[in-house]
Amino acid sequence: MLSTVNNNIVIALDAMGGDFAPLSVIHGAGFFLDNLVDPGIKVFFHIYGDKEEVSPLLLKYKKVSNNSEFTHCSDNVLANDKPSFALRHRKDSSMKAAIVAVKEGKAFGVVSSGNTGALMAISRFVLGTLPNIYRPAIASICPTKTKSFALLDLGANVDCNADSLFQFALMGSIFAKIALKIDNPEVALLNIGTEEVKGNDSVRGAFELLKNAPGINFKGYIEASEFLEGNIDVIVADGFVGNVMLKTAEATASTFINLIKQEVFNSWIAKMLVGILLKSKLNKALTRFNPKIRSGAMFLGLNGIIIKSHGNSDAISFAHAIKFAVNAISENLNQKIINGVSHIE
């Protein structure tokens, strides 16, 4: 059941998380309300933060103020806080208050640009995991040259056994159906080769669990050199490998895009030729890899929707993270995960 106020989807916002908070959060909420709300969906915000910083922004962004309720918090989680410290000592933080709002039924999901480790630790402590889920995983949508795919885990679990990887694959498949709008997503395990004998015990064990599992379109192994080809819809790895893979891909894409811009736009002749011949195609390609529209990572397997936006998110990035949360809620993602793993003993 959706958490609503007057039939609105309710999202809790951590106004103090991120490099550019609280402006990025409040402005982002306004951008979302102005540009990204789907027809027929109404969204209401519970906003948590420091009143001295947030209140002036709410006066400026009237539409956000009119569609929200603000609660003052005397503390906030810092970027360099260890998860254990944040859990024990940041008890009146905006991050924890937003998560507690989900626990108490005031909101259905949280969006935060704050400390990832602290967000996971507090969320897991306050909300717990869904039935039959051993560990939550961080999932995100990544671009390729032809389409997008879901990648998990992105850092929640550095070491994973076969059972955890198996569950990540099940959750990732359900996540992809909603996020990518694919009826039967193809799922693969990231490995150092495609032969069944390759990989460590956890990966090979997960392969055995998945190859005959019902309700999942498992395609075996995929190597890192293949993931940008766009042939697989869900790629599963442990949190260490997945995080390294994602950050390497992001850095490579950023470097490549900057090189193109430098080479093309340093010459007025090149600018003119690009404008005439390639502008629309180049813009389309650059948009596909634009991190601002892919700002949300989802914590799958928790008893509530938790979206982690990039720490350096600006207003547009944060707005897209809010949209990510609203889509997950409106599609009833967690109930579908519960149904999808109900056969696990």
UniProtKB/Swiss-Prot annotation:
Its protein name is Phosphate acyltransferase
What is this enzyme's class at the first EC digit?
A: transferase
Which compartment or compartments is the protein found in?
Cytoplasm
Quote the SUPFAM superfamilies the UniProt record gives. Isocitrate/Isopropylmalate dehydrogenase-like (SSF53659)
Tell me its family.
Belongs to the PlsX family.
Domain of life of the organism in this record? Answer: Bacteria
- A GO CC annotation given for this chain: cytoplasm
Give the chief site where it resides. Answer: cytoplasm
**GO molecular function annotation:** phosphate:acyl-[acyl carrier protein] acyltransferase activity
Catalytic reaction annotation:
a fatty acyl-[ACP] + phosphate = an acyl phosphate + holo-[ACP]
Q: How does it assemble?
A: Homodimer. Probably interacts with PlsY.
This enzyme's EC code(s) = 2.3.1.274
Source organism of this protein record = Wolbachia sp. subsp. Drosophila simulans (strain wRi)
Alphabetical keyword list: Cytoplasm, Lipid biosynthesis, Lipid metabolism, Phospholipid biosynthesis, Phospholipid metabolism, Transferase
Instruction: State which pathway it belongs to.
Output: Lipid metabolism; phospholipid metabolism
Recorded name of the encoding gene = plsX
Q: Which Gene3D superfamilies match?
A: Isopropylmalate Dehydrogenase (3.40.718.10)
Q: Which GO terms describe its biological process?
A: fatty acid biosynthetic process; phospholipid biosynthetic process
Q: Which InterPro entries match?
A: FA_synthesis, Phospholipid_synth_PlsX-like
Function, as annotated, reads:
Catalyzes the reversible formation of acyl-phosphate (acyl-PO(4)) from acyl-[acyl-carrier-protein] (acyl-ACP). This enzyme utilizes acyl-ACP as fatty acyl donor, but not acyl-CoA.
